[in-house]
């Protein structure tokens, strides 16, 4: 039974429910076909749906439990109807090009022995290949679409249902990019779903509801524009250290942060009026863990939040938010981006997020009011900017809400510009006074207006090189994949200075601020740079210890490349031993923070002692992470300041391009008399 229809989707090729298990195998080719069985018996009449963003097609299995579709290549969401007696998500988005020849496995496995009963229902997961139990695609909140768009997440009602937790829920709306593993044909195209608020759990197989194991809650990064929880696995941390690991999706882009109080009824909660919907999704995940994690063997009184990049900024938001008091007890902040570039758009005053750009308190060029003005003109409701501003002021709350909530995600996203690929140029976290204090980041942490818990924080030595790869003023891409450096000298200098600026504000200054209020601040620098030389591409020079490369090491997963297309350029058999050692080292420190409240000497007390941060700049106050083949893991002296960096950049004469030099200076320090005298 074969049906043919056209999709801009990817190819999948076998999905089955077998031996008390749901399992799916995706093979090459353009067919979707498979067999459905339960406890080894073929099941007829089971609905299987394949869809993209334009249409969907459903078929049912035949008497042999088999089904088949014939499809072109592209992007699919494959969903299997739950077997009788179960509810819940059993689908997964699949990215695959029709011209790929490799085989990709996507498994949906249900093991009845994994049953965990909570107030939300009884969840059934499956076993990972290392014996860890996992529960994926657990609904953390009702779908934030329709009237729930731009509202605080609504908790899921209690139930006694048997719920499939066998596949991660769909990613939140974002644009396709190399950083979210989309194929090149989907770069810049919308992927994901508004119905995306799902979480995933990993636990040791023998963990019971009385074990009170430490919990590690991961928040992914992606510039508040892209990313998803299913990129990361907690199975290695759970296996090695006996902890519970949780990760989750949160709304991003304008669906995650959209500060326009006029859109909401006055009776709406302060949380809904905050504009911080992605941040509220993160708070909601903590609330979910607090209520339910004991059923999985976790201790709600021993929760560690850790995140990278935008996830690190989110971790800072969790530390600062009045809503998270008592919901977590340790934190790790990996490569937060805290405004070293003058036009940064993270953690903004309300005026910046909301106002028009020409008001007395000017808003950002893509503030919510500016976006609304653009939308009214685009949709033919206003002839020009002045008319759009006048119309905006006369719209009732109901008219405004109906107009914006009725807009498709595609229409909404088309109003925004992007930078460095799929990152949206827009304000995100808002200082609303309810979800986030009405203070800037430095003031919040300098004055102690946050939850003081033991903290690991740090940055990577070559943070910004990952982003230089996407800058057209430094690199040229061949075939949309291979970056060629235009000028090696300028590239290395830019990578050095941008990365130093990142480290100063997000490591040195943040550590100094927090250590004024607490003693248990532990600071690191990630130095691993043993990528291979690929003849025309010396990846150690191109990337070095770049942004995001430390993530796999903190998760004891040395083969994790957050950008899958770079896997070949990062990992080799030659650097495997060093990577494995470093992953064991870093993850042991992270896990020991979760378990004891201090990284100390790691879980087995066999690593260098990690001492707390001090304002004594001559002290060894920084843990440097590297392999034994290089300089090893050791405490080092670390000291850098914006004033010192500025003096070095002003004295720099090594740039061949004046425009690159001028752009770097103004992006880090802003326009001043020094640079004005040099640059036109």
Please identify what each model-predicted range represents.
Residues 32-38, 65, 108:
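A short, amphipathic beta-strand motif
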Residues 38-54, 73:
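Short, ordered, surface-exposed loop/turn motifs in non-cytosolic proteins
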Residues 52-66, 70:
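Short, acidic Ser/Thr/Gly-rich low-complexity loop/linker segments typical of extracellular
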Residues 74-85:
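A short, solvent-exposed beta-strand micro-motif common in secreted/extracellular proteins
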Residues 83-106:
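Structured interaction patches on ligand/partner-binding surfaces of diverse proteins
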Residues 111-276, 300, 565-583, 597-601, ...:
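Non-catalytic accessory segments of hydrolases
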Residues 184-185, 291, 317-320, 325, ...:
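Substrate-access "cap/lid" subdomains that shape
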Residues 512-680:
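Mobile gating loops/cap/lid regions near enzyme active sites that modulate substrate access
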């Amino acid at each position: 039974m074969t049906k043919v229809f056209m999709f801009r989707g990817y190819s999948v090729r076998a999905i089955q429910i077998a031996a008390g298990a749901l399992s799916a195998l995706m093979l090459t080719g353009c067919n979707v076909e498979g067999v459905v069985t339960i406890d080894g018996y073929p099941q007829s009449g089971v609905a299987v749906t394949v869809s993209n963003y334009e249409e969907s097609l459903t078929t049912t299995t035949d008497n042999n439990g088999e089904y088949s579709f014939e499809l072109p290549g592209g992007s699919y969401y494959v969903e299997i109807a739950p077997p009788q007696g179960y509810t819940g998500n059993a689908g997964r988005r699949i990215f695959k090009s029709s011209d790929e020849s490799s085989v990709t496995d996507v498994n949906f496995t249900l093991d009845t022995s994994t049953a965990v009963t909570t107030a939300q229902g009884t969840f059934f997961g499956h076993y990972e290949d290392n014996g860890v139990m996992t529960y994926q695609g657990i609904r953390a909140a009702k779908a934030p679409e329709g009237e729930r768009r731009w509202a605080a997440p609504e908790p899921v009602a209690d139930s006694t249902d048997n719920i499939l937790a066998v596949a991660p829920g769909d990613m939140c709306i974002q644009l396709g990019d190399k950083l979210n593993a989309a194929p090149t044909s989907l770069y810049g195209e919308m992927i994901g779903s508004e119905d995306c608020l799902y979480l995933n759990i990993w636990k040791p197989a023998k963990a019971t509801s009385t074990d009170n194991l430490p919990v590690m809650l991961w928040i992914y990064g992606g510039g508040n524009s892209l990313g998803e929880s299913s990129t990361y696995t907690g199975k290695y941390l759970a296996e090695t250290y006996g902890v519970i690991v949780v990760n989750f999706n949160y709304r991003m882009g304008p669906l995650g942060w959209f500060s326009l109080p006029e859109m909401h009824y006055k009776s709406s909660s302060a949380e809904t009026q905050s504009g911080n919907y992605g941040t509220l999704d993160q708070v909601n995940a903590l609330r979910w863990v607090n209520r339910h994690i004991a059923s999985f063997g976790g201790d709600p009184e021993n929760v560690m939040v850790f995140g990278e990049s935008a996830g690190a900024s989110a971790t800072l938001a969790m530390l600062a938010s009045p809503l998270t008091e008592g919901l977590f007890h340790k934190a790790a902040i990996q490569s937060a981006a805290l405004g070293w570039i003058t036009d940064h758009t993270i953690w903004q005053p309300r005026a910046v997020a909301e106002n028009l750009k020409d008001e007395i308190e000017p808003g950002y060029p893509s503030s919510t009011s500016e976006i609304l003005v653009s939308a009214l003109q685009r949709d033919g409701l206003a002839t020009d900017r002045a008319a759009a501003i006048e119309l905006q002021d006369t719209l009732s709350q109901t008219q405004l809400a109906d107009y914006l909530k009725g807009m498709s995600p595609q229409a909404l996203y088309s109003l925004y510009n992007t930078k460095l690929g799929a990152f949206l140029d827009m304000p995100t976290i808002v200082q609303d006074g309810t979800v986030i204090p009405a203070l800037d980041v430095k003031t919040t942490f300098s004055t102690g207006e946050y939850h003081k818990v033991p903290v690991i924080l740090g940055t990577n030595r070559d943070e910004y090189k990952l982003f230089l790869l996407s800058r057209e003023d430094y690199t040229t891409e061949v075939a949309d994949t291979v970056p060629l450096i235009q000028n090696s000298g300028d590239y290395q200098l830019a990578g050095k200075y941008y990365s130093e600026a990142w480290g100063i504000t997000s490591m040195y200054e943040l550590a100094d601020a927090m250590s004024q209020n607490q003693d248990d601040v532990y600071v690191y620098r990630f130095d691993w740079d043993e990528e291979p030389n690929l003849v025309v591409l010396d990846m150690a020079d191109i990337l070095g210890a770049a942004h995001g490369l430390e993530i796999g090491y903190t998760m004891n997963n040395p083969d994790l490349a957050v950008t899958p297309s770079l896997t070949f350029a990062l990992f080799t058999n030659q650097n495997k031993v060093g990577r494995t050692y470093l992953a064991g080292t870093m993850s042991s420190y992270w896990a020991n923070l979760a378990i004891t409240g201090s990284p100390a000497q790691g879980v087995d007390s066999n690593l260098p002692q990690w001492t707390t941060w001090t304002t004594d700049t001559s002290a060894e106050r920084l843990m440097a992470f590297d392999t034994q083949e290089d300089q090893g893991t050791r405490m080092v002296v670390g000291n850098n300041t914006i004033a010192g960096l500025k003096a070095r950049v002003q004295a720099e004469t090594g740039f061949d391009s004046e425009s690159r030099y001028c752009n770097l200076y103004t992006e880090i320090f802003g326009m001043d008399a020094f640079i004005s005298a040099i640059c036109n």
